[in-house]
Amino acid sequence: MAQLLELDGSETVLEVGTGSGYAAAVLSLLAQQVISVERYESLAIEAGRTLQQLGYDNVVVRVGDGSLGAPDRAPYGGISVTATARDEPPPALLEQLEPGAALVCPIERGGREHLIRFRDGEEEVVTGVRFVPLVTGEP
């Protein structure tokens, strides 16, 4: 997923779904800064602690509704979503992209999930996948 963002190292990247922090760590090696939004406070605290202990100082982990992104830090040079959205990516995320930047997100359409890269109004289906669903609303 990180490779699909085609980063050059100067970007601020948004990650939706921190989980353990592994993908945020990978992104931190490819981007200038990573803002990672995790719905579950316990996961966010643990991932944030681990990332700091391991020296990933360019990662900021927040608790929140990832479908809303982090508009206070937008625009982003790439957005990676690690949970499946239904039919389309959340509009708020697309609005937070820099022109020419990519959003990579698993999408469920018609009972099938695919990893899709969205860029400048176009979409590219990459592969079939299976992710947890994207949960919206206040954590």
Task: Kindly label every feature range from the protein language model.
Residues 139:
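Extended, well-structured beta-strand/loop surface patches
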Residues 2-4:
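SAM-dependent Rossmann-like transferase core, predominantly class I methyltransferases
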